[in-house]
Regions:
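Catalytic and substrate-binding regions of extracellular carbohydrate-active enzymes
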Residues: 250, 254, 262-268, 272-479, ...
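Catalytic-domain carbohydrate-binding cleft regions of carbohydrate-active enzymes
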Residues: 1-311, 438-600
Length: 600
């Protein structure tokens, strides 16, 4: 980019390259480059060859919390201070949507314009092409494109914007390629005056007509957010670090956040269609053999470990005291059974003012307090579900969601070859094998055997600890003996309130978002939360997993079915439905925690 932009500028022609990228790339380059390289970059910035926008990179934004999102925007602020600029424009590319909870943060950082370019095969949320996105007294002007960026007229003006993108994982164009872009535009728009610009220039043009733009106040959400459920270990560690962040020093925060910022970045490993490139070996016995020996399998698994290193390096940047706290967290999520004694699995019990009973699957089939019912036989709490998805479900999803039927889209959004290993979907729940008690704590031990475990990826052993206290009921779930499985799967834990839930909300980045106020084509069912869910009567905090489906468990990223909160809140513990560059199988032990508190 430096060489091409300089070559075009020094040639004296009308063609220019003003290369714009997320702030992280330039910020990190200047942090690590040699003195000579830093000098070259500084000269390019001052000459107008290189520019950054207000966001560090494209993220699954609702996986973040407010402080991490603000840190990401501070990198642009650091560059602005260094070079005497004021960035007002930002861009997200590929991910189809983001949460409205980020609007106040964008405005607070001085950003006024956001361009969102959607993956060309994905459903575009039903929003105006250009609009004022408003939330909690703040706003950002947004331009939406059905592609990474395309020719777009700015409403009410004679100005248009054209994005000259290269493809995924490609660098900037050559000088001749830039000249060809100019020739093609001049041929198509012979009366136009062409001018290279960055996002700040585009922002100023759009802001000039801001008062004429429609106002939009609905949540959009992220129809790709299911991807972050593919690695429970990474998400669990990430969330715990964000919870402990207020205890860190400022220096610790900067060092750790530099690594943690790349966890919600939307690339989680190598491109599967390129580097795994295997439409066979879905049957588990065949998969287990090839996984041990094939270089392509080992290569993609190594890329997933490399992604986990962001969390490991963030942890290593902390003081011994704070690192020790992270190493200790959650180790007692499910106790080893010491001090517990067996009790009747069919019995009814009372503890700390709660009356309750466990079901044959280990879930709570009764939970009452002070005459109020939270769980019953039809509204279970802590209900575990394992499911595999069928070729028919993928075909239905593909037809409903995908707007472009080409080879790369079928690879990214499908599971080509899975029909050799599964014909129809599977749904399995565990069987309660033992119930133990220690004071106000109960430990349910379950098993999940049969086809789901023998042929697919269902964990064989499960434990749910439920602790009853005056102010709360806490749940801790653990699985062990989970086989890896290439057939796409989803694992859930559901909480279905018996009364309501009226006025339910999902918290994202510190804001309580109404899941019934999501635009068509947006992230309607599945959400990432930084805290949990609430309704008139209660609140459930989720400590270790981010994903929650409002209504029945839905991990497929698009549906036109209405949202039914009365069917409960289903927390997705793990899923492998995505293609692209996410984790394709998972066999680690895992544990998850939730805390329920009444709200009067």
């Amino acid at each position: 980019a430096l060489r091409t932009a300089r070559e075009l500028r020094e040639s004296g022609g009308k063609e220019r390259l003003l290369w714009t990228t997320g702030s992280f790339l330039i910020w990190d380059y200047l942090r690590t480059a040699s003195d000579e390289q830093q000098k070259e970059m500084a000269e390019a910035v001052r000459a107008g060859d290189i520019s950054w926008h207000g966001l560090p990179c494209t993220t699954h934004t609702e996986l973040m919390n407010g402080p991490l999102f603000e840190y990401g925007m501070s990198l642009s602020g650091d560059l602005d201070a260094r070079f005497g600029r004021k960035t007002i424009g930002a861009k997200m590319t590929d991910v189809p949507g983001h949460t409205i909870a980020m609007v106040p943060y964008l405005a607070k950082a001085g950003l006024k314009f956001l361009h969102i370019g959607v993956n060309p095969a994905s459903t575009v949320p039903d929003v105006p092409d250009v609009f004022r996105w408003q939330y909690e007294g703040s706003e950002i002007v947004v331009m939406y494109n059905r592609d990474y960026g395309k020719f777009t007229m700015i409403p009410g003006t004679e100005t248009a914007v054209y994005f000259a993108h290269t493809g995924d994982n490609h660098g900037p164009q050559s000088a001749e390629a830039i000249r060809q872009v100019y020739r093609e535009l001049e041929e198509e728009y012979p009366d136009a005056q062409l001018c290279a610009a960055d996002l700040n220039g585009l922002a100023r043009e759009v802001l000039a007509i801001k008062d004429t733009l429609p106002v939009f106040t609905k949540e959009i959400g992220d129809t790709w957010i299911h991807g972050v459920g593919c690695d429970p270990w990474k998400v669990r560690q990430f969330r715990e670090m964000l919870r402990q962040e207020p205890e860190w020093t400022e220096e610790e925060r900067k060092e750790a956040f530099r690594e943690l910022l790349l966890v919600p970045e939307h690339t989680w490993g190598m491109d599967i269609k390129t580097h795994l490139a295997d439409h066979e070996h879905y049957v588990r016995t065949e998969f287990e053999k090839v996984r041990k020996t094939a270089p392509n399998y080992q290569k993609v698994e190594a890329s997933w470990e490399e992604q986990r290193d962001y969390v490991r390096r963030a942890m290593d940047s902390l003081s011994p005291e704070h690192k020790g706290e992270l190493l200790e967290f959650g180790r007692d999520a499910c106790p080893d059974g010491s001090g517990f004694v067996p009790v009747d699995m069919d019995g009814e019990y009372s503890a700390a003012g709660w009356d309750f009973r466990f079901g044959t699957d280990g879930s709570l089939r009764k939970l009452e307090r002070n005459g109020k019912t939270y769980a019953d036989d039809s509204h279970r709490w802590g209900e575990v579900l394992y499911e595999n998805y069928s070729p028919a479900e993928y075909r239905d999803f593909y037809k409903a969601y995908n707007t472009l039927d080409v080879g790369w889209a079928r690879e990214d959004f499908g599971k080509i070859g899975m029909e050799t290993a599964i014909a129809s979907g599977i749904k399995t729940t565990p069987v309660l094998k033992a119930l133990l008690r220690r004071d106000n704590e109960f430990l349910a031990r379950m098993e999940m055997k049969g086809t789901a475990h023998d042929l697919y990826g269902a964990p064989a052993k499960w434990e749910m600890r439920v602790k009853f206290e005056e102010e709360a009921v806490s749940f801790a779930l653990r699985w062990t003996d989970k086989p890896a499985c290439r057939v796409p799967e989803g694992i859930w834990c559901g909480f279905c309130p018996a009364e309501g839930p009226e006025n339910c909300r999902v918290r994202k980045m510190g804001s309580w978002i109404d899941p019934l106020s999501v635009c068509t084509g947006g992230g309607m069912h599945l959400h990432a939360t930084d805290c949990g869910v609430k309704w008139d009567g209660g609140q459930i905090a989720t400590l270790d997993t981010a994903l929650v489906s409002v209504g029945n468990p839905k991990v497929m990223p698009y549906t036109k079915e209405p949202i039914r909160p009365e069917e409960g809140f289903w927390f997705n513990l793990e899923n492998t439905i995505w293609g692209t560059n996410f984790v394709m199988w998972y066999d680690d032990d895992a544990s998850f925690r939730w805390v329920f508190r009444e709200q009067m």
